[in-house]
Amino acid sequence: MNFKSVVLCILDGWGNGIGDSKYNAISNANPPCWQYISSNYPRCSLSACGTDVGLPDGQIGNSEVGHMNICSGRVVMQSLQRIDREIKTIENNKNLRSFISDLKDKNGVCHIMGLVSDGGVHSHQKHISTLANKISQHEIKVVIHAFLDGRDTLPNSGKKCVQEFEENIKGNDIRIATVSGRYYAMDRDNRWERTIETYEAIAFARATCHNNVMSLIDNNYQNNITDEFIRPTVIGDYKGIELKDGVLLANFRADRMIQLASILLGKTGYTEVAKFSSILSMMKYKEDLQIPCLFPPAFFTNTLGEIIADNKLRQLRIAETEKYAHVTFFFNCGKEEPFSNEERILIPSPKVETYDLQPEMSAFELTEKLVGKIRSQEFTLIVANYANPDMVGHTGNMEAAKKAVLAVDDCLAKVLNTVKEINDAVLIVTADHGNVECMFDEKNNTPHTAHTLNKVPFIIYPNSCNNLKLKDGRLSDIAPTILQLLGIKKPDEMTGSSLIV
C-alpha cells in the first residue's frame, strides 16, 4: 500500500459503549455520519486501558497515555506504573536526598502539593503519602496542599480519599494545610485567575479559612459543590510559604501543573511571588521551568512523528487548547520541540466556566482550518484531536454531551467529504480512551464524569481500498498501521502490529 496521505482524527473520550444504554451519549444522539461510517467502512476495536497501554491492570486510560501509545507504536510503561515500582526505594534518589538535606540545614517546612486522588491519571494519593512519610522521618515538618479530583473519579469521592490519606500519614508531623478543587489548582487553559486563587492560598494563606478538612468537604457537598469545584481554602492556622521552606510538586502528569509551577517560580506576569529555598517535582514538567525531578523522562526513538520527519515528509498537528499538548508534546512522547517539517495549529478553546455551557467548544473553527489543510495536500500525516467528547463528558451533563457528540459528528462529515476529494488519501477515525459513552453511574447513583475501561473504535476510509480487513488490537497498533498505509517500513522499536489483515 502506498497512499500519499493519512488524516488521523482522534475523537477524545469516544469509547465503545452499550448501544442501547440510556446513558450512552453517542447512541442517544444518533450521530448520522458516525452511524454511516461505522456501518460502511472497515472497523475494529482497540484496547485503551490497563496493561495494554502500560498502566496497572484495570486502570482507566487517559489522553496522555493514549496519545503516547498511539504515536510510539509500542506499549509505553506509564508514570503510574513506573512510580509504583520505584517509590519503595525513593529514599535513595539523589534529588530527594538533596532536597531533604536543604530542608534540614535551614530547618524548613516541606510543602507537598498534588491531587489527593486514587484516580491514577495525574497522580496517586499513595505516592503523596509515601513521600510525605519518608520526608517526615527526617524530622522535617510536612504540610500538604491537597487538590481534590471528582473528574477522573466520582464527583464526591474526595472525602473518602482524604480520609484514607490522613490515615496513611497518621503518627507523623504531617497535616493538610490547604484544600483546592482541581478546577482551580490544575487549570491548563490559561484561566490564570483560577490558578492564582490556589497559589495565593498556598503561598500567603490568603483564602477563606476552615478549621477541619472533613467538615469543609461536607459543607461543600451540602451546597452541591463537588470535589472539583471546591474553592481554595486554608485549613487551621497555616500561614503560608517561608524563605527557608521547600516545595514538592507531586503530580506526575505535566500538563495541569505547568501554570501553578510557573507562578511559583515567578515566570508569569504575576508579580507577588513567595520566595522559598528549594523545589522538586515528581516528573519533568517543562524544559524552561528547570525544576529538578524525582523521575527523569524516558526517551523514545523512532516514534511515528520522527519517522515521518526522517523521511523528509510534512506533518500537521491540530487541536484546540484543551488537547493541544496531547497532539504535540505527548504525541511526540515528551519531546517539546516540533520535528522537522512539523506544523502545529492551536485553536483557542472557548472561555466558559465549564464546557457543558458550550458543548461544541471550538470544533467548528478547528474543522474549518483542518479542511483547508487537507485540501492543500501539503501533508503526509495530519493528526487532529476533537476535545468535545472528553471535556463535555467530564461534566456529567447528558444533554450537553449529546450536543457535543452531534457537533463532532457534523465536523467529521466535513472531514470525510474533504478526504473523499483527495486521491490516495486515507481517513482514520479513532479515540484515545472512553468517556462520553457512559454518562451515569447507576451503582453509585451519580453522574459518571471519569474515563471508562471500554475499548475504542478504529475506522478507516481508504479511497481506493474498500475491501480492507481489520483485526482488533490496542492503541500501539495504530502507528504501524499508518506506516503500512504509507508504504514505510516499521522500525524494530515499534512492537505494535498493523491492524490490517
UniProtKB/Swiss-Prot annotation:
Entry note: cofactor: Binds 2 manganese ions per subunit.
Residues binding substrate, per UniProt: 122, 151-152, 182, 188, 253-256, 323
Recorded GO CC terms: cytoplasm
Catalytic activity: (2R)-2-phosphoglycerate = (2R)-3-phosphoglycerate
Cofactor(s) needed by this chain: Mn(2+)
GO biological process, one term: glycolytic process
Domain of life: Bacteria
Function description: Catalyzes the interconversion of 2-phosphoglycerate and 3-phosphoglycerate.
Family: Belongs to the BPG-independent phosphoglycerate mutase family.
Protein name: 2,3-bisphosphoglycerate-independent phosphoglycerate mutase
The organism of origin for this protein: Wolbachia sp. subsp. Brugia malayi (strain TRS)
Lineage: Bacteria, Pseudomonadati, Pseudomonadota, Alphaproteobacteria, Rickettsiales
